Structure formats: structure tokens, C-alpha cells
Amino acid sequence: MQSTYSREQYISLCKDIEEDDYRYYVLHNPTISDYDYDMKMRQLLSIEAQHPEWKVLWSPSMRLGDRTSGSFPIVAHAHPMLSIANAYTLEELYEFFSRIEKTLGYTPKYTLEIKIDGIAVAIRYEQRVLVQALSRGNGRKGEDITANIRTIRSLPLRLSKEAPEFLEVRGEVFFSRATFCQINAAQRQAEKPEFANPRNAAGGTLKLLSAKEAAQRNLEISIYGSLAEENKRSHYENLLLCKEWGFPVFGQPRQCQTIEKVVASLHEIEVARAQLPMEIDGVVIKVDDIEDQKVLGMTAKHYRWALAYKYAPERAETILEDIIVQVGRTGVLTPVAKLRPVVLSGSRVSRASLYNEDEIERKDIRIGDTVYVEKGGEIIPQVVGVCLEKRPEGTQPWVMPEYCPVCHQKVTRESDKVSVRCTNSLCSAGVIEKIRFFCGRDALDIDHLGEKVVTKLFDLGCIHRRCDIFQITEEDLRQVPGFKDKSIRNVLKSIEKAKSVPLDRFITALGIPYVGIGGANALAQHFLSLESVMAASLDDLKAIEGIGDKVAESIVAYFHQPEHLEEIQKMLSLGVHILPCHRASSSCLGKAFVITGTLEKLTRSEAETYIRNCGGKVGSSVSKNTDYLVVGQDPGSKLKRAQELGVPILSEDELLKLLY
């Protein structure tokens, strides 16, 4: 069909929608209705479908995400993209000021910017059109995430004539608190793992292979720096320039003439922190004068002219209404706090972790208390303390029940006197948790078999134990509410795929008490086959580094229970094929690793798995026995400790080279 539009009209329509996007997403002052906007966008897509040769790189349709990629190419940064050192106390902050004054010979002006808890990116414009976006990576090279960055509505795809022709901006990609809550609600609805925090969600979204899927999540960005010949000498003035060029700059950057003003501003921002629409974990303090920045220079990893002052985790005060006891897959009873709902870090919190009975006793937590709740990097908040001044009269110390809250059989207390366990192998709570864990991401990784679906199949009588997973039929799945043909096909396909499982994952999936991912990997590396693991004696097991008496006894006891042996044999008869382990022979064999900071290419869990698969060990703290510290973005105190001990430090890229 012949188009009734000219190319000039097409370009004019692009400009109109571009202006609408700027008013809506940057100025938050729309001038047309959502309906009118949608009609314009439909018109644009129709024209581009008829005339694909007209489509420009800055077309608003580029934000819809039309690329699916199998990878993210690694590209060198034109300018190093280093991280910023952290300070957690005023003492560390004054040490930073002292170093600056000692080098410069005077007290400079400082610019303060809120430290949004997101993902740093570099975005390049040529002829004022967005042509490339890279992740931070190792600071020297990053991944090309251009397609996903284009989906950010507040980011201009084309700059006005007032902006430089060639420009690179640095920014933080993030989710607002409200959007993050919506994303996790969608994850729960789909029975997928929730994101621990907005930063993880943003990082995961930028790594989505489908830009169309990324576009649906509504990422945002705040620009914190620019590289252009037209830049002024003041960093603060350059941020104002970025705003004039159409970039979003959140948080009203401040210019401070004195150190006293800097410190006062830090306190003011902390007070206002909870009211911000996005998560922040501190304030970035930068020497304002660009020439001073050049004098101060940089280390291999950090700029010497900037510091991130980190705030303590956000805390909320609320009432502990009850303590609920949950039963896990190994039968361990875990107390969970039921709270009077309170808003914390932008989300509504009604439950919090209490860990165990000893922790409750140590903190003297009682039902009816006013408690303090914090949410760090975890999904579930924690009760960190009690306001004793507000304790009501008549409260009683809490004690663990003597009977399982699900099957009502008497519980047993472990020799460590911390763990209380329901030993009834038929307890429905424990059975459902075992099946759910068996299907989970760290085990067989069977898609769409989350807690709700597993519970429904159990209640329907379709499954009674783990081996029944491999006998699930199409008729069984049709009884699950919401399951249609496509979902059913996907589940059955995923179950079939899970029948071929590496030895370490199968051992993990069994859920042997005290045997986690690391222990399962150690067993697989040592014995190479399931038969050898099952036949191992106590002495055989104790000879493996990292397997102590308690773990060895648990493994032997597990494989001496007839019902466990029978279930494993049933799985094998149903076509489960356990892939033998090939002993690692890399330079990682036997080496002890510790990881600090946020990795760009791998999740923490993936990095730990790769290290273990190559025969290495992963620890949680740095000591003289640590062979390597792997450092990601925003490393913690472990880096300082490693430097003091002379522990070799690896970047993420160096780790990958060592592994492969």
C-alpha cells in the first residue's frame, strides 16, 4: 500500500514523540493524554513498517526493543571507567579531605551527588545521536548493552543542537522503589526468584538478551558526568550543562565551599533519604575543579578526587505482632517475625527473619515488642533490636514449641542446641520443601515448578516425593490453575532436560543435611560417581578437605536410610542420568578464593560455582590462608584486609582467565 506520508512528515513525527517523551519522563509534565501518545506511536510504527529505509537511529520506536542477542560483545572504554573508594565513618571522610589538601595545598570546592544504588554505564553520542552504551566491566573494557540502554525512556536518543556533536556521558541505571516492587510482584506471580534489591534487578535487566523484555521493565537513569571538549572547568557546572542538553540528573547536586558545609549536607541528605523515589546508599563527594582532579589523578582502581560516603542500612520501627514457626526441607524449625506492616526501603514489610531461638533469646525479642528492622542486601528484612523503653507490661520470653506446627509430632533438639527439627519424614511441610528445593535453581533448575505449583500438585495427590517429578503427566498439569498448553509443554520439556544432571547438582538436589553447593562439589570432585559417594565410609569422607565429622556423619546416615536409596533407584529407573564428574586439573585446584564487591559478568553464585567446578574453594573472609581475592565493583573491607596480608587480587576478567 502506498504511504500517504512523506519522509519529512516522518521526521517531524519522530521529533514530536521525542518531545513528548522528554516532557513526560524528564520534566514529569506531559502535555498530551496517554491515548494521544499511543496513537502517535502507532502511526510511527506504521510508517516505519512501510518505509524501513526511513528509520533513523534516534527513532522513538528504538525504545521498544526489537533486538534479541545471544551475547554482549566486550568493547574497550575510550576512557577508563574506574570505581570510587568508600568511606563509612566521619574519620575516614576527614582523612580523605586531609589527603586532598595535602596534595593541592588548599581546601577546594566539592560537589555532592546522591549515590544511587544502580549500575554504572558509559554512553557515547556521535553527531548527537546515541550510538553505543557500555557497562563498567573491569573499568578498561565493558559489555555492549546499547540495545537495552535505548529502552530507557528518560534518556535522549538524539541531542539538541546546543549539545556537543561528540559526547560521552556516565550514568547510573536504576529502578525506582515503585517499579522495583512491581517487578518483584511479577516475579512472585510467575513463581520466579525475587530480586534482593533494585541494583540486582537493574543489573539483571541490562543483561537480558531480549531488549523487548528489558523495555517492559521501565529502567531509569541519572547522569553523573560527561566527557566533551565543551566541558567547563567546574564539575558542578558540567552537571547543569547535562540537564540543559536534555539528560536526567537526579537529586539536585550541591556545590559546597567548605568541609563543614559538606558534612552538614551529608546529614541533610540522610534525613531526606527515605522520601526519595529511588534507593540511595550514600553520597558521592567530588573535587569540583576539573584541573584539580587532573592533579590528584587516580590509582589503578579508584579516582583520588572522589569518595563515596556510605550510609548505614535503612531502619524502620514497628510492632512484633507474632512469631510464626516455619518448617524447612530438612525439618528444621525456623522462627519468622510477623510485623505490623511498615514501609522500609520503598517496600511494604510485614515479615522479617529471626534466624533461630538462640538469636531471639540473645536479643530478648518478645511478642508485642517495638522492634527495629533493617533491610540490607537480602530479600527478607531482619529484626536487629528491641526498643525496651516501649515494651508493654506482661510480655513473656519466647520459646520454641515442643511439637511441629504442621504434623504436630514432637520435635527434637540437635546436639548443637541451636537447631530444632521435625524428624517426621512424612511431614507435609518438609516434603513440599524438599520437592521445591529439588526443582530449584541451585539443584535441577526445573522451570515453572515453584512453591505454589509444587504445593498444588502435592495437594492434588500428583506427587508425594521427589522422584514423582519425573512421572508428572500432561493431565496432572492441566489441574493446576493458570496452566495452559504452552506452560504445560515448557514444564514437561524442562523435566525431560533435568533427567541429565551433573553429579554435583544431583547431590545438592538431594538436600543432605549440612551439605550445600560447596560440599556437593567437593564430594563430586573426590569420588567422581554417585555410586562411590553412596559407598563412602566415615573415614573416606573425613579425608576430604572441608568435610568435618558432622557433615560426614550426616552423609553416611543419609545413604543408610532405605527410603533414600529406594527413591534414588526409582529416579534412575525413570530415566535420570547422572553425569560423572571429571576431576579438575586447572591452576585453581585446591586454591582458596574470597569474593568482594559486585561482579559485572557473573552473579556471585555463578562465580562460586565456576571456582568450585575447577577444584577451588570459596571462603567468606580473608585470612593468611586465602590464595586469591576476587574484586568487583564497590569492594568492602575485605580488600583492605587482603592488601595488608599481601593476598593476590584478581579482577573478574583475571578470574575468568584463571578458570578457563
UniProtKB/Swiss-Prot annotation:
Residues 583-660 form the BRCT domain. It comes from the Bacteria. Signal peptide: none annotated. Its cofactor is Mg(2+); Mn(2+). The keyword Electron transport does not apply. NAD(+) binds at residues 34-38, 83-84, 113, 136, 172, 286, 310. This is DNA ligase. It comes from Chlamydia abortus (strain DSM 27085 / S26/3). The lineage of its organism: Bacteria, Pseudomonadati, Chlamydiota, Chlamydiia, Chlamydiales. The gene is ligA.
